[in-house]
């Protein structure tokens, strides 16, 4: 398997780690403040890397507008929706829903980039979607019996389930469309880290404006006042930004530029599988059988897409 396509798996591992780190930090920061700090930190790191290594070139600026649009869709809108969904649904169910960005990417790549789909690839995408449905409907213990008291907080739903599902699916669409928009610049030879820096920087600017003008005065009641946040809180969010955005997103952007968009994003969709043992260790609760079955379908679909693409 080409290393460019394996980048999807590396991104998935990074996002799994950041998903497990996120719920506690979101609880303390509040979703919008959490995402603003996270993206600003990631943007600053990427900017420093690009300036030191002189990665900004003419090719990047030729595609600047479309890359910035990619950042608005994938980072500002997509990432905000993603971590809002994590807060509402927990990391496991959000990860499973977010896996739909793989078939979305394949469909968008077919529609707008001419990346052809075979019947076998469509079948494999269908397996991913079936896995998502199974994991959502049967993915937590006692889901059919209605007993919720024994559930870990990460498996409980905050607010309406339908809103959480729509947020996660919106995040998946934002990720898929953002990756699609960044590909022309990468194909023309723009540096992947520079593309990632411009995307994340655009998202950071939009988040700072949105937070400063509106959300700063609308923190959730359970969020910790800024003066009470500790250095460990900021160290945690810096680590999360580095793992999930600086490393994970940059690797994914590089893969998108060197391989089929759908294949890379489908491999990045194995987060629901990677997260299961992490949740078992973190929460002390073994995931339900439906979670494992759904995850198996997701992995099988991803593997078949790779198989059918060569």
Predicted regions and their residues:
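Structural motif at transmembrane-helix junctions in multi-pass transporters
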Residues: 27-33, 80-97, 187-194, 250-270
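Transmembrane alpha-helices of multi-pass small-molecule transport proteins
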Residues: 11-21, 26-77, 127-134, 195-221, ...
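Membrane-interface helix-cap regions at the ends of transmembrane helices
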Residues: 42-60, 111, 133-154, 184, ...
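Glycine-/small-residue-enriched transmembrane alpha-helix faces in small-molecule transporters
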Residues: 1-33, 44, 151-194, 310
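Loop-to-transmembrane alpha-helix entry segments
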Residues: 57-62, 98, 105, 111-149, ...
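Loop-to-transmembrane-helix transition segments
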Residues: 3-11, 47-50, 57-81, 98, ...
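Hydrophobic/small/kink-forming positions within alpha-helical transmembrane segments
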Residues: 16, 47, 71-76, 103-107, ...
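Hydrophobic core positions of alpha-helical segments in small-molecule transporters
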Residues: 10, 37-38, 97-100, 119-123, ...
């Amino acid at each position: 398997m080409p290393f460019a396509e394996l980048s999807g798996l590396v991104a998935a591992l990074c996002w799994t780690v950041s998903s497990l780190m996120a719920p506690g930090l979101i609880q303390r920061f509040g979703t919008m403040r959490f995402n603003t700090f996270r993206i600003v930190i990631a943007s600053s790191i990427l900017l420093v890397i690009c300036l030191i290594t002189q990665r900004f070139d003419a090719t990047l600026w030729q595609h600047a507008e479309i890359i910035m649009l990619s950042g608005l869709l994938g980072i500002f809108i997509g990432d905000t929706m993603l971590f809002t969904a994590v807060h509402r649904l927990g990391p496991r169910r959000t990860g499973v829903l977010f896996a739909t960005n793989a078939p979305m990417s394949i469909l968008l790549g077919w529609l707008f980039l001419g990346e052809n789909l075979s019947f076998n690839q469509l079948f494999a995408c269908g397996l991913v979607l079936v896995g998502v449905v199974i994991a959502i409907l049967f993915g937590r213990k006692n889901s059919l019996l209605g007993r919720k008291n024994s559930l870990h907080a990460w498996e409980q739903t905050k607010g309406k389930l339908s809103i959480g599902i729509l947020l996660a699916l919106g995040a998946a669409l934002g990720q898929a469309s953002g990756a699609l928009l960044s590909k022309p610049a990468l194909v023309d030879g723009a540096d992947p880290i520079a593309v990632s820096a411009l995307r994340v920087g655009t998202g950071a600017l939009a988040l700072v404006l949105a937070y400063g003008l509106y959300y700063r005065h609308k923190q959730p009641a359970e969020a910790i006042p800024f003066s009470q946040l500790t250095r460990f809180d900021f160290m945690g969010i810096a680590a999360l930004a580095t793992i999930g955005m600086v490393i994970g997103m940059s690797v994914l952007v590089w893969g998108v530029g060197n391989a089929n968009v759908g294949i890379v994003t489908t491999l990045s969709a194995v987060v629901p599988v990677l997260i299961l043992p992490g949740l078992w260790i973190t929460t002390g609760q073994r995931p339900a059988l439906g979670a494992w079955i759904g995850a198996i379908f997701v992995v099988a679909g991803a593997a078949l897409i790779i198989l059918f693409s060569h």
